[in-house]
Amino acid sequence: MKHNTLRAVFQFSFFIGICTFIMIAGYSYQINYNQRMGIFYGGNITFKKVPKVVIYTATPFFDVPIENSILRDCSEKIKNSCTVTSNNKTFPIADAIVFHSRDINETKLSFFNKNRRYDIPYIMMAMENPFFAGLTVYHNFFNWTMTYRTDSDIFHPYGAFVKSYVPAEVNYSEIWNSKTKETLWMVSNGNAQNKRKELVEKLIKKGMSIDLYGQLYKKEPAECPRRRGPPGCDVKFHSPYKFAIAFENSNCKDYVTEKFWKKAGIYKTVPIVMSRKIYRDLGIPDSMYIAVDDYPNLEEFVHHIQNVTSNEEEYMKYHKWRKQFKIVDTNEGNIGFCQLCQKLAGYKRKLVPHKVYENLNSWHSTSTCDNSFATRFL
């Protein structure tokens, strides 16, 4: 009888324990579910359909909030399963946090260090090269990088070219007939590290015809003032030029910005760059641009430009790529965020290994740049 009583007490205690465990587990699940639905800390975050991936952008991009519209050119599958928001209340439920390097301040850094979430990646987004990225010392803070460099965790280029499935119809005669001027240089930043201003002015002294516009030269096209012109005026302004200077403010690994992509793309000019290696390393066709370092001196370079300027057959060789390829303008950041959504989906399935950058500055450093190029010609 005594043994039966003890057995009954044990069974009852075990039963109570199991019930308690189920209640706690169920409650924990409900809390987690409610948080995923945006019901936490008295918040009022709501999604019509709970996304599989939530990306919280903790900083703006040059003071402009990064919102879900950044995904507008992604596939429907990505848009239906991923949300990008700058709403601070999504911090506890986010699957990743993105910081733009030029918009991080000490207050934000202190908050996210103090309230660190170790279960999700902190992502550094930097579209500027190391000289202008605005990075200070971030030790063991970031897990992923999202930059223009191909070795970033998320490749976030300014532009890209893709092969056309069907050869495009290109009116070469129309392109040639629209070209009535030689070369344009539109430039705003005079604080370049690579002496591009000195190189351009040396080219002019060597006989190259270059029209100079932009903040650096305090000259704006009357028909298309910066940020105030009518839609499409930039295309109309650039279209008469055969060539356009596309020198970046620094010569860094993989650093090819809209200066190149727009000139070759919608402007239909031939970009002139400093060094071929940077562009060739990205797989950009050699015939899409002209590189100064293909020539032993500036005299021979200028002679080539002048020869091509007056020769339709030679000039149109730099447009033949248009039949097979097209340029995708990713300057609005969509390609990078599309890829980020995809990677995070894999991360949630534990397909992406956890990592942390011990010293981000050593990765995104000026050692990836070579600004000595122009000096050999000056």
UniProtKB/Swiss-Prot annotation:
Cystine pairs: none
Temperature dependence (free text): Optimum temperature is 23 degrees Celsius. Vey low activity at 37 degrees Celsius.
Catalytic activity: a beta-D-galactosyl-(1->3)-N-acetyl-beta-D-glucosaminyl derivative + GDP-beta-L-fucose = a beta-D-galactosyl-(1->3)-[alpha-L-fucosyl-(1->4)]-N-acetyl-beta-D-glucosaminyl derivative + GDP + H(+)
Chain ranges on the Lumenal side, renumbered to this chain: 29-378
Activity regulation note: Inhibited by Cu(2+) and Ni(2+), and to a lesser extent by EDTA, Mn(2+) and Mg(2+).
PTM characteristics: N-glycosylated.
GO molecular function: 3-galactosyl-N-acetylglucosaminide 4-alpha-L-fucosyltransferase activity; metal ion binding
EC number: 2.4.1.65
Main function: Catalyzes the addition of fucose in alpha 1-3 linkage to GalNAc-beta-1->4-GlcNAc-beta-1->3-Gal-beta-1->4-Glc (LDNT)acceptor. Unlike fut-1, does not add fucose to Man-alpha-1->3-(Man-alpha-1->6)-Man-beta-1->4-GlcNAc-beta-1->4-GlcNAc-beta-1-Asn (M3), Man-alpha-1->3-(Man-alpha-1->6)-Man-beta-1->4-GlcNAc-beta-1->4-(Fuc-alpha-1->6)-GlcNAc-beta-1-Asn (M3F6) or GlcNAc-beta-1->2-Man-alpha-1->3-(GlcNAc-beta-1->2-Man-alpha-1->6)-Man-beta-1-4-GlcNAc-beta-1->4-(Fuc-alpha-1->6)-GlcNAc-beta-1-Asn (GnM3F6) acceptors.
Record-stated family: Belongs to the glycosyltransferase 10 family.
PANTHER family linked: ALPHA-(1,3)-FUCOSYLTRANSFERASE C-RELATED
Name of the protein: Alpha-(1,3)-fucosyltransferase fut-5
